[in-house]
Amino acid sequence: MLLEAAPVMFFGGKGGVGKTTVSAAAAVRLAEAGRRVLLVSTDPAHNLGHIWDAQLSDDPTPLEPNLDVVELDPAATTERHLADVERSMRAMMPERMHPEIRRHLDLARHSPGMHEAAMLEAVAELVDRPGYDHIIFDTAPSGHTSRLLALPELMAAYTGGLMQRREQSDKFSRAVRGLGGTVDDPVERRNQEIRATLLRRRRKFERLRDILTDPAACTFHIVLTAERLPVLESCELYDDLTSNSIRVGSLVINRRSPADAGEFMAPRRAVENSALELLDSQLADVPRVELPWLPGEIGTRAALAAIAERL
């Protein structure tokens, strides 16, 4: 499955199904095959550092040959996003407005959608990071991920609307000149800076949208366990992704019980079979990978090797 993988991959699904383990195993498999891999966690409940027993940050940390890992800190990412916005606004607005800019951003820090917007900026920068053959995202649970991946289209449209209003303002300025009025050069320079900033942001979001919706560039792998609730949530996630034109590469069914484990495990296997029948009725055409329920501790480097062999 993975050796023909797209350059950008997302692993997501219901909380607790093993997204981090599977995404890390995929990264190990590709790195061992000689590919340069960047593994990124966007889940606020980070676990990648625990697997490698390493302290990770927003900067790529080399953990193995061909494998670098990043854990995006939501609070730090939001603070950097707000700092960038403040720098841009201070450069474009008159000095008397600077205290108001600070007040507005302080209020915006905890507003709905701010965290998602900041994470989107970080993802948009990472998907184009040079030097890697594959960039793999270990995502937050389904609902957070669905909202995040729907944002590029919304943000591109929102920025486009701001640019249209900016153009209307510029037309008014040109009309004033035509009537013999004047427009201060500093104002015109600020207008040009605003246009340039909006254009850069729109291009960034459009670039991310183009990558996410290009099946040759990006695939999303849904991780689940063979249980009714994860199956139902995975079907909803599939609908959300495909409605946003994001290709689902596979369903990774994690922790599958053995068929020959005897009388004790037989009821568990029956529950799983029933859940997979439900999955078949909804997503029968999606490629599927089954990963067995392995003995021993799962969140270790040795466990990753065992899982990587099966991907």
Features from the language model and the residues they span:
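Nucleotide-state-sensitive switch-loop elements of NTP-binding domains
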Residues: 1-9, 14-17, 22-203
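C-terminal lobe/tail of nucleotide-utilizing enzymes
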Residues: 1-3, 55, 181-184, 188-192, ...
